[in-house]
Amino acid sequence: MSKSDQLFEQARQTIPGGVNSPVRAFNGVGGTPRFIDHADGAYLYDVDGQAYVDYIGSWGPMLLGHNHPAIKAAVIKAVEKGLSYGAPTEIEVLMAEKVRQIVPSMEQVRMVNSGTEATMSAIRLARGYTGRDKIVKFEGCYHGHADSLLVKAGSGALTLGQPNSPGVPADFAKHTLTCVFNDLDSVREAFTQYGCDIACIIVEPVAGNMNCIPPVPGFLEGLRTICDEFGALLILDEVMTGFRVSLRGAQGYYNIDPDLTTLGKIIGAGMPVGAFGGKKKVMQHIAPTGPVYQAGTLSGNPVAMAAGLTMLDLLLEPGLYEQLNAKTARVAEGLKAAAAKHGIPLAINYVGGMFGFFFTDEPEITRYEQVTRCDMERFKRFYHLMLEEGVYLAPSAYEAGFLSLAHGDKEIEHTLAAAERSFAKLAG
């Protein structure tokens, strides 16, 4: 029995399911999750001493790779001063200014402790600002585990939302309308029926929780137009895409001007932190300047701010995103070519430092319902073949993959050689 096996068994005695976030349990692929001992550069190292080329990157924030020396030094320096004060600090001011400098739509910024806090707070602010209750989200998009967001579509196209988790009251869910990602007609229909009651649209500009699905041309622009027409706010959930698909995130990549933006752990270089921000006229409605309440004892934590500020400074170096885009394209196109060589149907999506692959005959994947039709059993087999080869992919067919700037020729060549052997076994 491996040490990971032992730890998983031990963990299940005191931690529900043996993990502190469900996807880590390997329910989507079967088997025992690998317990990680440490990470460096493009690699994870498990408790049994196995090294893996990492394509999760803590679900996105490790853009510079693990254990970056400059970020580590900044964290150590901050820790030597203290861990938490419960009072304002200079570094949180510098961090907010840096975010505003890079992402101009975020005229004012409020730090929080997670992506879930960011989206939950942004939605509360949108409701308070507009005086409306309903929100629009999209099937297959994930915005954290707040009650109003754990909602699925009802049985009809325009029925009110239904809870998709026990513990979410139906009275909460009824205020959430679920539309089809990349389908403006479904959004227009929702606004035609409920437009005067809708406070906001919240959307992942690149959907990263139905694998990786970029917006079709005109989709994000159409959402902006609809929001303007009906007086609703547009919230871009950039927890995954922020500073990843471009320096200015997806809003910079696609040239979209949102009212509010949410960010996650990438602004802490992987530490537990988040933020939301947007137009000053909207952000002024947040306490203490406005009536919409939001607070957090650990918000603006100085250690997380030190890590994040250092990372954002490093990302300003010219040419980094061109390098990242080229690395991602090389991996994605290499996977596609290796699958084709062995007659394995595979569709590939990628943008910036994100990618996704789908075992399907459909040449283009643009909607959630297409993802649900993919060959999940083949994905599970491929996942474990790659894991045995020392390549750590997301353990779910519904999660995106991420590259870092630490992925070099050696790591990419190893990955594609492993994929070649794995596809050969799948075809055999």
From Swiss-Prot:
- Please give the CDD domains that the UniProt record associates with this protein: OAT_like
PROSITE patterns assigned: AA_TRANSFER_CLASS_3
UniProt-listed InterPro entries? 4pyrrol_synth_GluAld_NH2Trfase, Aminotrans_3, Aminotrans_3_PPA_site, PyrdxlP-dep_Trfase, PyrdxlP-dep_Trfase_major, PyrdxlP-dep_Trfase_small
One of the GO BP terms on file: protoporphyrinogen IX biosynthetic process
Which Pfam families does UniProt cross-reference here?
Aminotran_3 (PF00202)
Q: Which GO terms describe its cellular component?
A: cytoplasm
Write down the chemical reaction(s) this protein catalyses.
Answer: (S)-4-amino-5-oxopentanoate = 5-aminolevulinate
Can the keyword Protease be found in this entry's annotation?
no
Question: Pathway membership of this protein?
Answer: Porphyrin-containing compound metabolism; protoporphyrin-IX biosynthesis; 5-aminolevulinate from L-glutamyl-tRNA(Glu): step 2/2
EC number(s) on file: 5.4.3.8
Primary site of residence: cytoplasm
Asked if the keyword Transmembrane belongs to this entry, the reply reads no
Q: Which cofactor does it need?
A: pyridoxal 5'-phosphate
Q: Which domain of life is it from?
A: Bacteria
Q: N6-(pyridoxal phosphate)lysine-modified residues are where? A: 265
List the molecular function annotations (GO) for this entry: glutamate-1-semialdehyde 2,1-aminomutase activity; pyridoxal phosphate binding; transaminase activity
Which controlled-vocabulary keywords does the entry list?
Answer: Cytoplasm, Isomerase, Porphyrin biosynthesis, Pyridoxal phosphate
Its localization reads: Cytoplasm
- Sorted alphabetically, which Gene3D superfamilies does this protein's record hold? Aspartate Aminotransferase, domain 1 (3.90.1150.10), Type I PLP-dependent aspartate aminotransferase-like (Major domain) (3.40.640.10)
Q: Which HAMAP family match?
A: HemL_aminotrans_3
Quaternary structure and interacting proteins, as annotated: Homodimer.
Tell me the protein family, please: Belongs to the class-III pyridoxal-phosphate-dependent aminotransferase family. HemL subfamily.
Please give the name of this protein: Glutamate-1-semialdehyde 2,1-aminomutase
Q: Which gene encodes it?
A: hemL
